[in-house]
Curated annotation (Swiss-Prot):
Keyword field: ATP-binding, Coenzyme A biosynthesis, Kinase, Nucleotide-binding, Transferase
Name assigned to this protein: Pantoate kinase
Enzyme Commission (EC) number: 2.7.1.169
Pathway of action: Cofactor biosynthesis; coenzyme A biosynthesis
Entry function: Phosphorylates (R)-pantoate to form (R)-4-phosphopantoate in the CoA biosynthesis pathway. ATP is the best phosphate donor. Can be replaced with UTP, with lower efficiency.
Notes on temperature effects: Optimum temperature is 40 degrees Celsius.
pH dependence: Optimum pH is 8.5.
Pfam families reported for this sequence: GHMP_kinases_N
Catalysis: reaction(s): (R)-pantoate + ATP = (R)-4-phosphopantoate + ADP + H(+)
Family: Belongs to the GHMP kinase family. PoK subfamily.
GO BP: any one term: coenzyme A biosynthetic process
């Protein structure tokens, strides 16, 4: 009996700092930088169907879903690229467009779900390559797919899913606050912004999670991306000596350590996150009777 329905999960990713690397070959395009693969992400349900459809859901902190989009150009292009028809539903556990890598998680999770559903026998790296090509094409991101292939806090030394990536696990909690979304493509398509980001990129490799937090903050300060709303939150964190920076690319803040929750909750809903120990996974599949 063949599979008719597959559920997959992919963790999200908070980028602390990044440097776009653009190449004519999308496999060699992407970004270098550092970030954190987080425990929350996107659950994907893929079901065989005569026609392709996509629905996007946002779940609240209780897991209750709300449909927020009846289609997705990115996922529809993915289905066409993989030459399959399927009904896709994605359930995002964190706000979209807010620096949590939900777009990448939905994309990579969908590739893994379709791989299992249609028995393509693609390796995890091959799945990541497909997702990365679609991500670069749509400018929905440049480095999140590469990061979300596995867990840990991540240092991407070279671009793309085949790049040199270092991963280390840390058990300390991370707390995040979202103020408003930012459209990633609006930043990636701005030549002036890319030039400023390039000048702000750290000149050394971080040694640990604390170092990533420090370099992320330096990058955020130099890049000119910090808004007045983010500045207010960061100042409050600074007064409590909390390592904190801006979620890239999103209008929000992430901070390290248990005390961060008390500070951040003064400004809105706070998400408690942990570092994910791994990347995408197939949760279960249903077979025809």
């Amino acid at each position: 009996m063949e599979l008719t329905r597959v559920t997959a999960f992919c963790p999200g990713h908070i980028s602390g700092y990044f440097l776009p690397v653009i190449h004519d070959d999308p496999d060699l395009s992407g970004s270098i930088g550092a970030g954190i693969v987080i425990s929350e992400g996107v659950r994907v349900i893929a079901e065989k169907s005569a026609d392709s459809t996509v629905k996007i859901f946002q779940t609240d902190r209780y897991g209750l879903p709300e449909e927020i989009a009846e289609s997705s150009p990115v996922l529809m292009d993915l289905l066409a690229y993989m030459q399959v028809n399927a009904s896709i539903e994605t359930f995002c556990h964190l706000p979209i467009g807010s620096g949590y890598g939900m777009s990448a998680a939905a994309l990579l999770g969908t590739v893994h779900a379709l791989n299992a559903l249609y028995n393509f026998h693609l390796s995890p790296r091959e799945c990541a390559r497909i997702a990365h090509r679609i991500e670069v094409q749509h400018q929905s991101g440049l480095g999140d797919i590469s990061a979300c292939q596995g867990g840990g806090f991540v240092i991407r030394k070279t671009p793309g899913p085949d790049g040199d990536i270092m991963r280390v696990i840390d058990t300390r909690p991370i707390y995040a606050l979202t103020i408003s979304p930012i459209k990633t493509s609006s930043v990636l398509s701005s030549h002036d912004m890319i030039a400023q980001i390039t000048q702000s990129f750290p000149s050394r490799i971080p040694q640990n999670l604390d170092d990533i937090m420090s370099l992320s903050r330096e990058f955020a300060e130099k890049s000119g991306l910090i808004s007045k709303e983010i500045r207010t939150v960061l100042t409050a964190c600074d007064k409590e000596n909390l390592p904190a920076s801006m979620t890239m690319l999103g209008c929000g803040v992430f901070a390290l350590g248990k005390r961060a929750e008390t500070v951040l909750k003064k400004f809105g809903e706070v998400f408690k996150l942990t570092i994910s120990p791994g990347g995408p996974a197939i949760l279960f599949g249903e077979r025809s009777s």
